[in-house]
């Protein structure tokens, strides 16, 4: 059965599914020949595009994944690593919904470490150094083996609209056209990409690959606002020319942890070391002497770069009083001599880069295999999207990843799976899914993107979530796997494993809350006062862990994930309950829906700036309205009063 509109599907049933319908190419009509019919077309095969394509195909949609180079699918062009603060939570959540990133990482890691382990569980962050070639190869194999999914090399330049401004197809640079109901744009840094080394530049999405030309003009003709952003990547050096003996070893953690909640994806393997060195006074002097050659400081690049991943020249300028900066030396794979110089991103000329690198302890004789460079690219401010990631202007057009203004593989994957789910649901005539910000980091990420006017690359941080104590890595499956199951991305075996885990956590929590120990049976340092104490109250004491219960012969044999989940839920139960109560209180007010056709210009109680912002962004709820820059608490209160009066029938929606 065709999922295309009747007027288009009728023309796609002849012969080899080719058709010659007349479609609208914005301001003009044209007759095109559709080579094939799909339900969903995904443009770009980076981390966002891969998750989007897999989600749509697994939900039964005939999906086409179009990439400019089939050999660089799921490539990690910058740091070959997954996870880190806030990013690991995103990876766990993608996995909980039924995505792929966590599984691939658990098969291709070179090293794993838990960051912030000395702090509370809300900010624990698993990080993996990955083998970039193995990662790309493994994920490509998954894509190629997925039913309903077709991979094709090409460059999409045209988006075809039907009579009601709905998606009906796409066209390539070489005039090959595909009919479809939904399009997901995951263009990364390729959209109008230009790379810079010193004062010289060339058109490229990344080093050695063409930029995507033509699509930006199409989007602008469709009425979308576009902008420019910038990012960069450091040089790669030859490990055979590096002296690791003068560096600080960064070994993997002794206890192996996993990104995926599915044990079927876990692969134990030998891990490698990373290394730490630091910049020196000589490094800083070389940079200062050549700062005028940086395209960022000469004015050649005007696009904004990522605030939380600055270039080394930015660090030297912004933190002029700092004597040294950490630089991590990380392997890119098991079968390559290339090392990634983390923290040393730059766009200075290549000869200057070599001089800079050779001032670092251990790199005095290093050979550069690939120079660092900056890349600027086009993006669409995501306030033009709903929280479903479908654009407000064109039904069936979704955006995910760097085109929405984000930076990072994890942020891209998180948006990709949401866009893929919703594109499939649109095609199937089902309600689209919105993840609330209080329920996940993915929800927080998307809410920020579609609400706030972002003019620099957005990176997920734990501080961006008001509810990080309940949005932990360990409970991502408890928060999102039921939704993944309902949507259709969690299979029976995975669901069975999830239910078994939940039952084990519930059972052990009940045991800890009901089992009491007499103070006489406890070591002196634990017997605080006479009487008895539950195991749960004992576990809540500072410095005590589940392992201490085992030393008292009061533990039971539990899976590591279950044990950690139980300990966190018990130990922080008071804080968690208070945050859940806060979420309920805030959600009741913030979830209040604003009429889609409300004319803010007629609400004289709102400030002028507020009316302009609200009319442009069109927030869905009171909570979203309050997070828009320029909308202050007084404006939110006035809006609430208006809605209350309108609901009570004391004024008409058309008159304030």
UniProtKB/Swiss-Prot annotation:
GO MF annotations in UniProt? flavin adenine dinucleotide binding
Binding residues for FAD, per the UniProt record? 44-49
Write down the required cofactor(s).
FAD
By its UniProt entry, which Pfam families does this protein fall under?
GIDA, GIDA_C_1st, SAM_GIDA_C
One GO biological process this protein is involved in is: tRNA wobble uridine modification
Tell me where it resides.
Answer: Cytoplasm
| Source superkingdom | Bacteria
Query: What is one term from the GO cellular component aspect held by the record?
Result: cytoplasm
Indicate the principal place this protein occupies in or around the cell: cytoplasm
Q: Which NCBIfam families match?
A: mnmG_gidA
What family is this protein classified in? Answer: Belongs to the MnmG family.
User: Could you describe the subunit structure of this protein?
Assistant: Homodimer. Heterotetramer of two MnmE and two MnmG subunits.
What is this protein's record name? tRNA uridine 5-carboxymethylaminomethyl modification enzyme MnmG
List the source organism.
Gloeobacter violaceus (strain ATCC 29082 / PCC 7421)
Gene this chain is encoded by: mnmG
């Amino acid at each position: 059965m065709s999922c295309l509109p009747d007027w288009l599907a009728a023309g796609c049933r002849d012969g080899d599914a080719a058709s010659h319908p007349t479609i609208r190419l914005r301001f003009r009509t044209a007759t095109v020949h559709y080579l094939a019919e799909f339900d969903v077309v995904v443009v770009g095969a980076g981390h966002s595009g891969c998750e989007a394509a897999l989600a749509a195909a697994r939900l039964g949609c005939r999906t086409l994944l179009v990439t400019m180079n089939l050999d660089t699918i799921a490539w990690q062009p910058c740091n070959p690593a997954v996870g880190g603060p806030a990013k690991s939570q995103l990876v766990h959540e993608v996995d909980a919904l039924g995505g792929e990133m966590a599984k691939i990482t658990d098969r291709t890691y070179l090293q794993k470490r838990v960051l912030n382990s000395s702090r509370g569980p809300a900010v624990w962050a698993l990080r993996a150094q990955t083998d970039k070639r193995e990662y790309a190869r493994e994920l490509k194999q998954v894509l190629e083996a997925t039913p309903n999914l077709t991979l094709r090399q090409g460059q999409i330049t045209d988006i075809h609209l039907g009579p009601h401004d709905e998606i009906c197809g796409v066209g390539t640079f070489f005039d090959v056209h595909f009919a479809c109901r939904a399009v997901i744009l995951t263009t990364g840094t390729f959209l109008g990409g230009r790379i810079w080394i010193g004062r010289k530049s060339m058109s490229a999405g990344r080093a050695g690959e063409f930029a995507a030309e033509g699509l930006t003009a199409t989007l602008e003709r469709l009425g979308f606002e576009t902008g420019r952003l910038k990012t960069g990547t450091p040089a790669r050096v030859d490990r055979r020319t590096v002296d690791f003996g003068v560096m600080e070893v960064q070994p993997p953690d002794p206890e192996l942890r996993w990104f995926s909640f599915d044990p079927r994806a876990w692969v134990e393997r030998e891990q490698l070391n990373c290394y730490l060195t630091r910049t020196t006074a000589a490094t800083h002097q070389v940079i200062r002497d050549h700062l005028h050659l940086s395209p960022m400081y000469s004015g050649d690049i005007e696009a904004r770069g990522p605030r939380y991943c600055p270039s080394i020249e930015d660090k030297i300028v912004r933190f002029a009083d700092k004597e040294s900066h950490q630089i991590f030396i990380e392997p890119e794979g098991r079968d390559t001599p290339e090392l990634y110089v983390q923290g040393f991103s730059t766009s200075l000329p290549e000869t200057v880069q070599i001089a800079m690198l050779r001032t670092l302890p251990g790199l005095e004789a290093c050979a550069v295999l690939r120079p660092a460079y900056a890349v600027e690219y086009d993006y669409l401010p995501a306030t033009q999207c709903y929280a479903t990631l479908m654009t407000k202007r064109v039904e069936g057009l979704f955006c995910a990843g760097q085109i929405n203004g984000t930076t990072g593989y994890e942020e891209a994957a998180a948006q990709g799976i949401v866009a893929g789910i919703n594109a499939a649901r649109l095609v199937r005539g089902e309600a689209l899914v919105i993840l609330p910000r209080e329920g996940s980091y993915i929800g927080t990420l998307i809410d920020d993107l579609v609400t706030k006017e972002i003019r620099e690359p957005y990176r997920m941080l734990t501080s961006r979530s008001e509810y990080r104590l309940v949005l932990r890595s360990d409970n991502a499956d408890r928060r999102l796997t039921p939704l993944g199951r309902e949507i259709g991305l969690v299979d029976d075996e995975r669901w069975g494993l999830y239910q078994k885990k939940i039952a084990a956590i519930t059972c052990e929590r009940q045991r800890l809350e009901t089992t009491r120990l007499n103070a006489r049976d406890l070591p002196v340092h634990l017997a605080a006062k006479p009487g008895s104490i539950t195991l749960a109250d004992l576990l809540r004491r500072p410095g005590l862990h589940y392992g201490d219960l085992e030393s008292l012969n009061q533990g039971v044999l539990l899976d590591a994930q279950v044990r950690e989940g139980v300990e966190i839920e018990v130990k922080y139960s008071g804080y968690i309950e208070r945050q859940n109560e806060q979420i309920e209180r805030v959600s009741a007010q913030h979830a209040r829906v604003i009429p889609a056709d409300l004319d803010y210009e007629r609400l004289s109680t709102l400030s002028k700036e507020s009316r302009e912002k609200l009319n442009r962004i069109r927030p869905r709820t009171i909570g979203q309205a309050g997070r828009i820059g320029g909308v202050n608490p007084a404006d939110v209160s006035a809006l609430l009063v208006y809605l209350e009066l309108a609901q009570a029938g004391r004024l008409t929606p058309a008159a304030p």
